[in-house]
Amino acid sequence: MKGKSIYKSLVGLMFFGALQAFTSCSDEPDAENYYTFTGEMVSDYLDNRPEQFSDFTKVLQRSGLYGMMATYGTYTCLAPTNEAMAQYLKERGFSSVEELTKEECDTLSWNHIIAETYFTTDLSDGKIPTANMNERFLTFSCDSDAVEGGNVMYYVNMASKLVVRDDSVENGVVHTLNRVIQPSSAYLPELLLEDKNISLFTSALTLTGLNDSLYEYIDNTYYCDPDSVNKGIPFHRTGAEYRMYYPANRMKRFTALVETNKVFAEAGIHNLDDLKAYAKDVYDKMYPEDAGLYDEDWTNRKNPLNRFIAYHLLPYYGAINDFTISESGIDYKTTCAMPNLIDCTDWYTTMMPGTVMKMSSPSEGLFINRKGVASRFSVRGTKVYTPTEMKTIHDQDLAEAGLPVDTLNQQALNGIYHYIDNVLTYNEETRDVVFNDRIRWNVVTMS
């Protein structure tokens, strides 16, 4: 009897609970169950500071991105101030945002929004890992500002200073800029020509005709089925289904590793004739079977100067933090089997036929064709300067040469270029000493 009594009580409780659950279902929850949202979205952050961002807010509204900035997600908003927008408009002969076309507002908006959240603590000197919504990568760099008492200042594309940074909002982060971001629309050869600090290199690039190879951007031979782009291809892993999406377009991009005029001068190379002689001395030794056969045929791939320039060019995009595993944000100790015995290294083909270059990243920075570990090297190699170092060198060298110091932009529409600290060649030491090594190739760089 006792068991039946307990059973009836349990059934009664279950029925009462079900009844309560049924009767409590309502379109309007009790007041104490309301969630009151108090945080700011990106859109709120901008709206609540009209004295700073009213012009940029108008641009976002006209482009249609304003609504996205009011939704949940993970965004980085690089917001130019009203003063920055006024300067941008003045440079184009406009007096207000209303004079911009819809297309111009689209481009402005896309250039300043990244669909991922990046605080300055997440970034290092080099490329911001995710492209902006205009599918352009931006450069992040830092420098000390004497006017600000030596405090570290952060820049996007070497020109737009983060005057306020790391303001967290519910759907990302906002950084305030003192200048509108203007990614270059120039192709890589055109951007190189703008830099007066590398005029000797660009003269040789033009003479060899290799500049013509750097104008490619979109591969018109590429085709991918729309379903593979939009719906993806299913695959299974660890019991779960995933989808792999193919790119709609295949883009062609390039990297140039460039000596400044000062680096050439320190090696005794002061003009184009000096550079021709230097290249001939190196490559006649490397290719004795071709010595003297193509000396005046500058566009021939076996010409010494042509070989010299081609070895400075890579047929893909490489920011300084792209080249080795340790530079890609992956933990150094987990990616190198014995980090005390080997630097993180990768190998890349160049645009000089039949050649590669070795990229290593000891703590001193990124080096080309280095032999050894950390400071224990037998061949130092050639250092690739960071964006911060590059801007400093650019400004100092132009000032020393009595030339106007203009704005530096290393990112072209279809590529990027870096300053290097020594004359780069594929010489006998590189072939016989540096490349006398076990080649460990990161398969990602082969795609």
Spans of features found by a protein language model:
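Mature, structured domains of secreted/extracytosolic soluble proteins
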Residues: F22-S447
